[in-house]
Amino acid sequence: MAGSMKDIKLRIKSVESTMQITKAMELVASSKMRRAKERVEHSRPYFETLYKTLTEIAAADPRARNPYLRRSEIKRTLLVVIAGDRGLAGGYNANVLKLAAQESGNVEVLPIGKRSAEYFAHHEAELFTQEVLLAADISVGQCFQLAHQITEGYRKGEFDAVKLCYTRFDSMMTQTAVSIEVLPLAMEPTEQQKAEARRSQILYKPSSEEVFSAIIPEYVAGVVYGAVCESVASELAARRTAMDAATKNAGEMIDHLNLYYNRARQAAITQEITEIVAGAEN
């Protein structure tokens, strides 16, 4: 019985130690969430403004034959996959990687995030770059460099489509793994936008098509950076939720173990009293 009580006591200490770690990780994730949410909110207007500008240019010259708008048979796809740099975030990494794995055909992968790079290296996928890009540390400048490489490869015909898999930040409790097509652009101006473009006095120099092509790398950079911001915020929210659940589970386990310990202690005391009484009677 004494050995059993000792084992329970050791297990309680082990769970308490784990609970301290999960609680600390929950607090760290919570402290980083505010800045991550601000990055998400600040990145969205930039992307929306660029998309609006591209739509206006497309509406002003609907006959333009821009390669970024042209749709042809997709023989090869560049897949940008954003995952986390660490684990212990519930199903965050597994969900986005599972979604990316559903992409079939001739695919080249640009992984962002340590877990994404490890996953596709393990599966021997053809990689766009051998550099490991950490999602939490990637800068706006790096996104612009990637965007120029992506648009240059698309323009040269190295791939016919660019898709992006990331985790959209809906709320602290909800994050959704999504896949979007970045290139070619699915841009169909409405009749109202076309009418407004005809009435506007905007002149694009040297031409609307060249201005459109010049903005595309900025647009792709904005999409990638925005997706990184959303993914990082989603990872922190998922980790906070997972660590909160782990902390609560650890607390419940400690309560159960304390109950078992007290019962074992009570049984040991009762046994000792019984033995003393039996010895006195003899």
What do the predicted segments below correspond to?
Residues M1-N282:
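C-terminal beta-strand-loop-alpha-helix "lid" module of Rossmann-like NAD(P)-dependent dehydrogenases
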